[in-house]
Design a protein with these regions (language model features):
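Beta-strand/loop substructures that line and gate deep hydrophobic ligand-binding cavities in soluble
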Residues: 87-111
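Sequence-level motif detector for i,i+2 pairs with an aromatic at +2
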Residues: 9, 57-59, 94
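Short leucine-rich amphipathic alpha-helices used at interfaces
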Residues: 59-60, 66, 109-110, 116-117
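A generic alpha-helix structural signal
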Residues: 25-29, 74, 125-128
Length: 134
């Protein structure tokens, strides 16, 4: 899927960050820690591509969440483990840093989550709003 096609997917949210990719990733990981969530992994996909002799724009995937919030979701909908822990992609799009993720309401719809369980994912929007705020 080309990046322009991804921008048309209503289930994917993309926001513009005023910081460079590395700065956005650093701010995100700091925010995750400050909120008491668990940082599971940070994958610098560009660095991995370079190790394979390939070129890729700056592309970093951050995996994080709260087992207290995610476990009930996975217990109710086991296939939701395909999308959990939560992931945020921080990437360079022709000199602009973008932050993309699967919308919490799209995840809730995909796995037919109750309103209570959907609420366990909803904080992602506020987190990314704060991330991209100047």
């Amino acid at each position: 899927m080309a990046e322009d096609e991804a921008g048309n997917d209503p289930g994917i949210v993309t926001k513009l960050s005023h910081l460079p990719v590395a700065g956005t990733v650093a701010k995100l990981t700091d925010m995750i820690s400050a909120k008491g969530m668990r940082l599971f992994a940070v994958i610098d996909q560009r660095a991995e591509a370079q190790q394979a002799g390939l070129d890729l724009r700056e592309t970093t995937l951050v995996f994080f969440g709260s087992p207290a919030a995610g476990t009930p979701v996975m217990a109710a909908a086991p296939l939701s483990a395909l999308d959990l822990p939560l992931k945020v992609l921080v990437w360079d799009d022709r000199g602009q840093t973008k932050v993309s993720y699967v919308a919490p309401d799209a995840l809730a719809a995909r796995y037919h989550l109750s309103a209570d369980l959907a609420g366990n994912l909803a904080g992602l929007n506020a987190l990314t709003d704060a991330l991209v705020a100047p």
